[in-house]
């Protein structure tokens, strides 16, 4: 006869004792279960003991998580978390260096468990760790262990980062600024300061004032990839916490110190593979660089500004007045105004007063900046573009100003200028770190592409929107290839002619239509069982291989990873935390299990609980697209295993 549904067969281990094989009644209070286990081994005071999972992080069993115990689970009897916390915190005060080190090692092993972490925190464990960190008596392994344990306990969110004292933060800053510091300490100190900066504006200002940018540049230029990554993380955190004016000043200084060139040559093109965390921080840095353009993008032209009127005249003169000559010399004021208005229309402005075209935001003054940059950095190409089109009388002229304004809007949209940084994205473009004035340089390539495409399409003014759609497709397809330099981008985008775009569109349309043709549908129905079998086999194989996922908190992107895979017999999902840079773990080494039979449903997008919790801001759009959750039976309640796919390809 099969046991009741709420009874599971498990093994319980204890050091130097024969394991017990018991039937655990999940309806029985945990205290009663513990007493029975202790009685079987003749152990008094069962309240001094607790059950833990025997593998992985050895999490304590509580009334909240006991339903995770399944048939075949192996548990171990250990000291209760409150008593273990007391013992280890006493060990931190040991006069023996070795005693303190052993206590820290054990504390670090148990710190990921929330039950244990709460016991430590309630006994002033964070303050005791803080004392070790502040005293700095041992700048080697003991300090590194204390920092790691402190970070692990804070990660639970039981205590706010804003509660940290100024002297404590200053001491951690000292470890970052010190020379000849232990290599294991500084990445941890940088990681702690990153958390502080992202969570507390007040303490973030302290970190900003105490950690010189030059010191972060030193850390970025080391060969230690972990130290390099953590330095970049703190740098992007400081930039995110700065005001727009401060951010511009900081980035200008970093660029003067050749940080851009160093990133391009020594990080992006390093022999070592670029880690996911570094890729995310480079994405954030790129977004902040492009974000400097937002004020110009959102500022309309002021018709009463003398400087802006002069810039418009410089644009006109560069196209129609040879150097040192003035076409309007000797003309009356009315004739000169009439001539200027005609030349502005030839330049491609819709109004004889060009200020009216640039009142639209976006792109505002950013479009004027782009046009001026093109006219000054590529004067021959600029003159050729304008004169070639202004002299045509067959209605096929390409309006330079109108095209530039719309192209600036398009580029801002494709590059998400002014949008908040995503918590998960790693989508940076290497070419933005390989070029000064990268946005304006990209505009110069793109405006010449637009003129080329206009001629290939033999477009007229009525076709303007169609041309912009084609140019958008050309730019989007090429940006998606992530070319490593602007020259490579130029080569690839110019190879994507209007004819090639049409061919790609036709291929995609034929593929879509072909799959719907009656003979194809009939053949598909015949092959469907076999195809479904192959698809099922391939997907099961992919699930068994497993995937690395990032842990995402409600506050920020985490650098922690976890791995999930399907067991070889397809009956259990196995998962657990892993370290970055370590190869995929074996299924047997993963501590957590979820029987497939307990799974209720698969949720995606906005239906996922971790997406609903994060709200609907722009920065969470990509999170929504990559989110999925597995709901499963957790006793009488429904629980969730939440995921953020590494990419849209993996999501598909």
UniProtKB/Swiss-Prot annotation:
InterPro entries in the record: ARM-like, ARM-type_fold, ELMO_ARM, ELMO_dom, ELMO_domain-containing, PH-like_dom_sf, PH_domain
Subcellular location, principal: cytoplasm
Keywords of this entry: Apoptosis, Cytoplasm, Phagocytosis, SH3-binding
Location of this chain's protein in the cell: Cytoplasm
Molecular function per GO: SH3 domain binding
Residue ranges annotated for the ELMO domain, each copy included: 307-479
Entry protein name: Engulfment and cell motility protein 3
Subunit comment: Probably interacts directly with the SH3-domain of DOCK1 via its SH3-binding site. Part of a complex with DOCK1 and RAC1. Interacts with ADGRB3.
GO biological process: actin filament organization; apoptotic process; cell motility; phagocytosis
Function: Involved in cytoskeletal rearrangements required for phagocytosis of apoptotic cells and cell motility. Acts in association with DOCK1 and CRK. Was initially proposed to be required in complex with DOCK1 to activate Rac Rho small GTPases. May enhance the guanine nucleotide exchange factor (GEF) activity of DOCK1.
A GO CC term assigned to this protein in UniProt: cytoplasm
One Pfam family matching this protein: ELMO_CED12
């Amino acid at each position: 006869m099969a046991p009741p549904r709420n009874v599971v067969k498990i093994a319980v281990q204890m050091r130097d004792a024969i394991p017990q094989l018991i039937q655990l009644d999940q309806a029985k209070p945990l205290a009663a279960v513990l007493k029975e286990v202790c009685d079987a081994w003749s152990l008094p005071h069962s309240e001094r003991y607790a059950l833990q999972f025997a593998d992985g992080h050895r999490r304590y069993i509580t009334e909240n998580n006991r339903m995770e115990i399944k048939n075949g689970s192996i548990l171990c009897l250990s000291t209760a978390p409150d008593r273990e916390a007391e013992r280890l915190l006493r060990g931190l005060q040991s006069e023996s260096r070795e005693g303190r080190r052993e206590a820290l090692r054990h504390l670090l092993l148990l710190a990921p468990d929330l039950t244990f972490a709460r016991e430590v925190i309630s006994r002033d464990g964070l303050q005791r760790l803080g004392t070790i960190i502040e005293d700095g008596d041992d700048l080697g392994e003991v300090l590194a262990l204390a920092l790691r344990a402190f970070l692990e306990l804070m990660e639970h969110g039981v205590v706010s980062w804003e509660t940290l004292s100024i002297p404590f933060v200053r001491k951690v800053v000292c470890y970052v600024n010190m020379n000849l510091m232990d290599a294991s300490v500084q990445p941890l100190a940088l990681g702690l300061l990153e958390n502080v900066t992202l969570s507390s504006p007040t303490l973030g200002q302290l970190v900003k004032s105490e950690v010189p940018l030059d010191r972060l540049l030193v850390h970025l230029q080391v060969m230690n990839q972990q130290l390099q990554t953590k330095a970049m993380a703190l740098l992007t955190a400081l930039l995110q916490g700065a005001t727009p004016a401060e951010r511009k000043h900081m980035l200008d200084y970093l660029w003067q110190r050749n940080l851009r060139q160093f990133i391009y040559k020594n990080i992006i093109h390093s022999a070592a593979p670029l880690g996911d965390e570094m890729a995310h921080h480079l994405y954030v840095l790129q977004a902040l660089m492009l974000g400097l353009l937002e004020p110009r993008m959102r500022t309309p032209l002021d018709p009463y500004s003398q400087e802006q009127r002069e810039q418009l005249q410089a644009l006109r003169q560069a196209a129609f007045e040879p150097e040192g000559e003035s076409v309007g010399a000797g003309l009356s004021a009315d004739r000169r105004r009439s001539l200027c208005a005609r030349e502005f229309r030839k330049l491609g402005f819709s109004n004889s007063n060009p200020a009216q075209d640039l009142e639209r935001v976006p792109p505002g003054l950013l479009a004027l900046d782009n046009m001026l940059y093109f006219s000054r950095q590529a004067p021959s190409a600029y003159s050729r573009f304008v004169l070639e089109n202004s002299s045509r009388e067959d209605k096929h002229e390409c309006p330079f100003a109108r095209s530039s304004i719309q192209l600036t809007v398009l580029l801002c949209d494709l590059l998400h200028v002014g949008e908040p940084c995503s918590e998960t994205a790693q989508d940076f473009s290497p070419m933005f770190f390989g070029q000064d004035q990268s946005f304006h340089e990209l505009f110069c390539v793109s405006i010449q592409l637009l003129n080329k495409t206009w001629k290939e399409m033999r477009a007229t003014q009525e076709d303007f929107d169609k041309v912009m759609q084609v140019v958008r497709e050309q730019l989007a397809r090429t940006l998606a290839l992530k070319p490593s330099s602007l020259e490579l981008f130029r080569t690839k985008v110019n190879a994507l002619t209007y004819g090639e775009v049409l061919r790609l569109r036709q291929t995609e349309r034929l593929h879509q239509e072909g799959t719907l043709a009656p003979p194809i549908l009939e053949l598909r129905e015949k092959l469907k069982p076999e195809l479904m079998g192959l698809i099922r086999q391939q997907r099961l194989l992919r699930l068994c291989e497993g995937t690395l996922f990032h842990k995402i908190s409600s506050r920020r992107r985490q650098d922690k990873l976890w791995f999930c895979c399907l067991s070889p017999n397809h009956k259990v999902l196995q998962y657990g935390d892993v370290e970055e840079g370590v190869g995929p773990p074996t299924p047997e080494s993963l501590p957590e299990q979820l029987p497939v039979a307990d799974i209720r449903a698969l949720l995606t997008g906005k239906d996922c609980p971790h997406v609903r919790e994060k709200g609907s801001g722009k920065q969470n759009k990509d999170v929504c697209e990559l989110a999925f959750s597995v709901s499963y039976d957790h006793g009488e309640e429904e629980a969730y295993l939440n995921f953020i796919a590494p990419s849209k390809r993996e999501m598909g």
